Amino acid sequence: MMADEELGDEVKVFRRDEDADDDPMISGETSEQQLADDKKEAVMEAELDGAGRNPSIDVLKSAFPKVEPMSPSFPGLMSHFSPGYSAAALPMFMPLFMNPYAAALRSPSLMFPMGAMSPTFPMFPPSPVYGAAIAAAAAKQHFENMAPLNMRAGHPMNQMGMPPYMHPSSMAPQNVDRRAQGGGKAKKDDHVKKPLNAFMWFMKENRKALLEEIGNNEKQSAELNKELGKRWHDLSKEEQAKYFEMAKKDKETHKERYPEWSARENYAVNKKKTKKRRDKSIPSENNDQKKCRARFGVNNTEMWCKFCKRKKKCEYATDRSGGSDITDSQDGRGTSGAYSSSSESPSPKANAGIALTTQQQQAAMMHTMLMQMRLGSTTGASTHVPSPLASSSAGRSPLDANASDSESDVEEEEDEQIDPTVMQQTHDMLMQESMCTI
């Protein structure tokens, strides 16, 4: 009685009155054959829909299994979703229905390559209509499509012309071959080693024997070379002659093989500094261009200028573009005792005072000669015009006093030579002033 009452209550909740007569659950009729037919029809409809849809959407759908109806009472459970965006194609909505194979291919951002799965490879158990041959072909295509789209040769996303995708296992033998060949770095073919000398031949023959001796295995290369050098010096000339002969033959063979070779070609540093060395190798025309080190030597540092002592630019070295310096005859550093001509450039530092003194002396000499010529011209004339320059010593001007002082200086330094250019300038000025006075 209790079971009948519970059955009656369930019928009142879920059953409608107008469908009471047609309900197979109430009538008690069996529908196993009808359920099997419904399953076959659903599979056929899904295959027909997949053939007419966009393959890109089918790729997404094929990565997830299709949920079968639980019972005939729930035939339209998944029909509420649109055909293009079914629940099986949306991992964020239905993550529990995802196939474990598709989950392995999914990236952390729930996105995976469009061609990771084949549209023709179903993830749910195939229907009895298809045979084992179709399943095998689909599995083969599935493994071929495991490569990303951007690595496929004919895919439009491969716009950079990348090589076809290759499995890492196929590239392993190439890596092994590259390591066996020496690491992949190409050696320079144009580098030619110079021939070995006698000592190098001696080292080449005896180095291995030296390493085999007890206690030499842990020594460094420098220590081994030192020991080989001692043994080389201990050899007699007859024993060394053997290695000299080997070095001679090696040099001749090397010369025949590389007739135009020179050892300088192996040193690129010298190639870069060739131009600079040529510029510095310009010979000096006179001794004035030399520094104190070249003039007086390394032992005579007391004669060096103060700049050379501090390793600075020499005081007496001139620029290559200019003339020579004024030589200093007072301290013994000059090359000649006479002063340089007016066309030569004076030294800007230490010789500035000397040049100023020389100019003052020349001006005084010019003034003295001018006064003498004026006095001679005025005494011979008929009319004497008094001039302040010819006044007495008591009332003479400062210029006359300077002239008289300079006369004594000139008498004391009669041995000095006067530049002919200065003499010519003095003569011209004298003639002009004489004409003005007359």
UniProtKB/Swiss-Prot annotation:
UniProt keyword annotations, A-Z: Activator, Cytoplasm, Developmental protein, DNA-binding, Nucleus, Phosphoprotein, Transcription, Transcription regulation, Wnt signaling pathway
Region (Disordered): 1-39, 250-288, 318-351, 378-438
Stretches the record annotates as Involved in nuclear asymmetry: 88-130
Chain intervals with Polar residues compositional bias: 324-339, 378-395
Record has Phosphoprotein as a keyword: yes
Modified residues (Phosphoserine): S118, S127
Acidic residues bias spans: 406-418
PROSITE patterns: HMG_BOX_2
Entry's Gene Ontology cellular component terms: beta-catenin-TCF complex; chromatin; cytoplasm; nucleus
Entry-linked InterPro entries: HMG_box_dom (IPR009071), HMG_box_dom_sf (IPR036910), TCF/LEF (IPR024940)
Pfam family, one: HMG_box
Tree of life domain: Eukaryota
Location within or outside the cell: Nucleus; Cytoplasm
Sufficient for interaction with beta-catenin/sys-1, as annotated region: 1-45
Disrupted-gene phenotype: Knockout specifically targeted at seam cells causes an increase in seam cell number, but this is caused by a combination of anterior daughter cells adopting the seam fate, and abnormal differentiation of posterior seam cells. RNAi-mediated knockdown also increases the number of seam cells as a result of anterior daughter cells failing to differentiate and adopting the seam fate. RNAi-mediated knockdown in L1 larvae causes a severe loss of M lineage-derived coelomocytes and sex myoblasts.
Gene Ontology biological process terms from the UniProt entry: asymmetric cell division; canonical Wnt signaling pathway; cell fate determination; cell fate specification; embryonic pattern specification; gonad morphogenesis; mesodermal cell fate determination; mesodermal cell fate specification
GO molecular function, one term: beta-catenin binding
Biased composition (Basic residues): 270-279
PTM entry text: Phosphorylated on Ser-118 and Ser-127 by lit-1 in the beta-catenin-lit-1 complex. Phosphorylation promotes the interaction of pop-1 and par-5 and the subsequent translocation of pop-1 from the nucleus to the cytoplasm.
Basic and acidic residues compositional bias, start-end: 9-18, 250-263
Residue ranges for the DNA-binding region feature of this UniProt entry: 192-262
Reported function: Transcription factor. Part of the Wnt signaling asymmetry pathway. Binds to the consensus sequence, 5'-(C/T)TTTG(A/T)(A/T)(G/C)-3'. Activates or represses target gene expression, depending on upstream Wnt signals and interactions with transcription co-regulators, such as beta-catenin/sys-1 or zinc finger transcription factor ref-2. Essential for the specification of the mesodermal and endodermal cell fates in early embryos. Required in many asymmetrical cell divisions in the early embryo and during larval development.
Sequence similarity: Belongs to the TCF/LEF family.
Subunit architecture: Interacts (via N-terminal region) with beta-catenin homolog sys-1. Interacts with hda-1. Interacts with bar-1. Interacts with par-5; the interaction is direct and is enhanced by lit-1-mediated pop-1 phosphorylation. The interaction also leads to the subsequent nuclear export of pop-1. Interacts (when phosphorylated on Ser-118 and Ser-127) with lit-1; the interaction is dependent on the beta-catenin-lit-1 complex. Interacts with wrm-1. Interacts with homeobox protein egl-5.
Name of the featured protein: Protein pop-1
